[in-house]
Amino acid sequence: MRIGLLAFAVAARYVEALPVASGEEVASSSAPTTLPSTSSSSALPSPTKYTLPHEDPNPEARKAEIALKRGGFLYGPSTLGQTTFYPSGTLGTAMSQRDQALWLRDAENQTITAYREANETLRDIQSHGGLKTLDDFALLYDGHWKASVPEGIEKGMLSNYTSDLLFSMERLSNNPYSLKRLHPTKDKLPFSVEDKVVKQLTATTLAALHKAGRLFFVDHSDQKKYTPQAGRYAAACQGLFYVDARSNQFLPLAIKTNVGADLTYTPLDDKNDWLLAKIMFNNNDLFYSQMYHVLFHTVPEIVHMAAIRTLSESHPVLAVLNRIMYQAYAIRPVGERILFNPGGFWDQNLGLPATAAVDFLSSIYAHGEGGFRAGYVENNLRKRGLVGDTFGGPALPHFPFYEDAQRVLGAIRGFMQAFVDSTYGGDDGALARDFELQDWVAEANGPAQVRDFPTAPLRRREELVGILTHIAWNTGGAHHVLNQGAPVRASGVLPLHPAALYAPVPAAKGAVASSDGLLAWLPDEVKSVEQVSLLARFNRAQVRDRNQTVRNMFAAPELLAGNGEAYAAANARFVEETGRISREIEGRGFDSKGLSQGMPFIWTALNPAVNPFFLSI
């Protein structure tokens, strides 16, 4: 079936006229009720067979279609800070409006459910007299949020929240993007810790740990430049971690606040002081992770935009990209309207204001984050000394993120390898004959300004496999480690991970007389329920029932019908492999030492049978 070019233009005018909800209002059924999953426009029917340009029996119509898209789908200014371009032009605006309508409709049930469960939870907490101790935070979760967060919070996250091992291993699971190993000669020690303290904790010196490649660092000191909202407070923590030579565990060594008296805390301090230090650190880390994750939106977006402008809707590569970029262009404008707007959900819950969050995103992009190939998992982790060349230090004894990511990535790469091989007949030379593909690579390196994209011409199928694998990993893997259901289930679980602090950073140690004294820094029952409710709305509990999980990533009927038997066979293998991964993750328990993957909590953030295949929030 030939793409209807007139239909594309008509769709642009139609979708552009769709009402867009304000605040939490959800778009009604004015949006189309069914949307082809492999078309750049809601009114573009998918071809019955996808073809490469040199095999298309109607090349002139194909060229005209691309010309129409290039004229109406344009690179507009970045939204939500200064990162990559955002769609503009008649067709670009139409796609944005369509995706926003889709997103708002998908979010409706989750939002209604989370609000209902929030009210029920608050009533239950108040019936117990409120949050009077740290352990009372269990009331936030016990028996609640069963519809909006059906998997519940990660096992061990509440029962072991005081554990130093839990705190340190969060850097290798909940947020693996802020940690680096300090190079013994290229990196200086970021701050000092008393020799006798280091000796007592590690049986060696700080310099020796550094020289041996056993010292790791997280730096949130740049958050110091932002002013917290009235009545809220924030540190700007730096943290040192190490691989212990005796226990072979990854453990915390020290936390420096960088504000006020600029105290440095260690595990040898009073247990309540040290727990407060970990809470302050996690508050900074939650801010970091929620804004860093936006790069997992912007990077695939700009590559997809370049593809829309250069590939025909009949091209099999664009068909796959359109599938995995489902509703992708909703997030930035919706975020601006209801999350990062003045007084919006961010300001209602976080310590630092939304203006700081958006500035932070712009800042990390301006300083080089968001490179395409630099974001490949192996490249990213190697650069930070976490895998591969470990700067002469020992390998991490456990790295849960990497362990699970390797498996999910392997399944995605296996599918993409089979897809590319079947599309190009196992012939690298066929890439050169695909002038649309080569135009895409040139466009990405040119007008789209994609950072660190493979250069034109693309000569090897393996390069294309890498590109497609990375985009699919961003939408179905990396994003969900930091966002989606991960914050409500792990990285935002109270009391260890408050979105804001409600008392000043201490000017001296000994400020916390008892564990219950920590409540002064933590949200009360109302703000606690609001935090959980917001994070619950990030989750997408319905995708499993709707067959929209990572396991279904490539299973769109149009793709199965239009790409032939080899594609269908590759999809079947992918479904089988991701099923095995999911069963293993869901079957995890604690070993005889009370650990799972070396951690005192069970991490499930990369479960392909739970996560959406798309950029959900």
From Swiss-Prot:
It catalyses: (9Z,12Z)-octadecadienoate + O2 = (9S)-hydroperoxy-(10E,12Z)-octadecadienoate; (9Z,12Z)-octadecadienoate + O2 = (11S)-hydroperoxy-(9Z,12Z)-octadecadienoate; (9Z,12Z)-octadecadienoate + O2 = (13R)-hydroperoxy-(9Z,11E)-octadecadienoate; (9Z,12Z,15Z)-octadecatrienoate + O2 = (9S)-hydroperoxy-(10E,12Z,15Z)-octadecatrienoate. GO terms for cellular component: extracellular region. Gene3D superfamilies: 3.10.450.60, Lipoxygenase-1, Domain 5. Its EC number is 1.13.11.-, 1.13.11.45, 1.13.11.58. It is found in: Secreted. It comes from the Eukaryota. Mn(2+) binds at residues 293, 297, 479, 483, 617. Three His residues, the carboxyl oxygen of the C-terminal Ile or Val residue, and a fifth residue, usually Asn, ligate the metal, which binds water to form a catalytic base Mn(2+)OH(2) for hydrogen abstraction. The keyword Glycoprotein applies. GO terms for molecular function: linoleate 11-lipoxygenase activity; linoleate 9S-lipoxygenase activity; metal ion binding. Residues 23-59 are annotated as: Disordered. Residues 23-48 have a biased composition (Low complexity). Its main location: secreted. Disulfide bonds: none annotated. Glycans are attached at residues 109, 119, 160, 547. It is an enzyme of class 1 (oxidoreductase). Lipoxygenase that metabolizes linoleic and alpha-linolenic acids to 9S-, 11- and 13R-hydroperoxy fatty acids. At the end of lipoxygenation, the intermediate products 11S-HPODE and 13R-HPODE from linoleic acid are then transformed into 9S-HPODE as the final product. The intermediate product 11R-HPOTrE from alpha-linolenic acid is transformed into 9S-HPOTrE and 13R-HPOTrE as the final products. 9S-HPOTrE is further oxidized by the enzyme to 9,16-DiHOTrE as the end product. Also acts on gamma-linolenic acid producing 9-HOTrE(n-6) as the main metabolite. Belongs to the lipoxygenase family. Manganese lipoxygenase subfamily. This is Manganese lipoxygenase.
